[in-house]
Amino acid sequence: MGANSMIADVTHDLNEQISQLMQCKPLSEQQVKELCEKAKEILMDESNVQPVKSPVTICGDIHGQFHDLAELFRIGGKCPDTNYLFMGDYVDRGYYSVETVTLLVALKVRYPQRITILRGNHESRQITQVYGFYDECLRKYGSANVWKIFTDLFDFFPLTALVESEIFCLHGGLSPSIETLDNIRNFDRVQEVPHEGPMCDLLWSDPDDRCGWGISPRGAGYTFGQDISEQFNHTNSLKLIARAHQLVMDGFNWAHEQKVVTIFSAPNYCYRCGNMASILEVDDCKGHTFIQFEPAPRRGEPDVTRRTPDYFL
């Protein structure tokens, strides 16, 4: 078999898998294993501060709400027609973490230049054992193998992205240990999310109305004030910090005099919060538009069988 026909076969298989996943049907354990091996090769080559070109559509938390991710693609455009940047938290809380994260990883393997998937604080072994992804893998596959395959892959996800050298995108927020983007570029990200330190802060911190650094009520990361954002943006020649990590009722929320924006893309979070979701479209001229959306219509949702702790991340 020639190289071209092998590539054609792989592409055909991936297209079939994406089509299956779009119907919210999980792949087999073996397919997940092979897919994640391919994804690892792609992600290994990406930077801790992954450069992204505009136009791009920036998205926040999804949390296993598969039907709302499908709605997001209906509203924002299919990948690869639209270039996407997701800022983490694909799993936990929602009922379809397996299908959600598998679809995003499959799109990454199929269209590596058209989708960027960053790591959120939930892309971690410890957090997923408490908030649903581990249990869901056990229920859908009969063992923890798929959970292990994905949590091993999460170690390779880039931590941050930089759109056109001006918009800094990440899941959580800033760190007192990080002054420059080069500081981030220089650390080894291939590990479980630590309990403290710069890598932890990027995935856990939140903007705050108070100046300076504060102790985070989350027990990880810090709160950071407008003075911190302004200094970081100035030092690194940035126009905006885009982040996710916090439920905001309108789907987006400006802070720090429009130096920081929070984007949240899981509508009616946990199927009960009543919030809108949004995505941020950055055009060729670096202008930006928020698109808000409501939950996708649902049929036959499963009832919650076991209450997960009410701890909003």
Curated annotation (Swiss-Prot):
CDD domains: MPP_PP2A_PP4_PP6. Pfam families: Metallophos. Coiled coil: none annotated. Mn(2+) 1 binds at residues 61, 63, 89. It catalyses: O-phospho-L-seryl-[protein] + H2O = L-seryl-[protein] + phosphate; O-phospho-L-threonyl-[protein] + H2O = L-threonyl-[protein] + phosphate. InterPro entries: Calcineurin-like_PHP_ApaH, Metallo-depent_PP-like, PPA2-like, Ser/Thr-sp_prot-phosphatase. One of its GO terms (molecular function) is metal ion binding. The active site is at 122 (proton donor). Predominantly expressed in stems, moderate in roots, nodes, leaves and flower buds. Keywords: Cell cycle, Hydrolase, Manganese, Metal-binding, Protein phosphatase. The keyword Cell cycle applies. May play a role in cell cycle regulation. This is Serine/threonine-protein phosphatase PP2A catalytic subunit. It comes from Medicago sativa (Alfalfa).
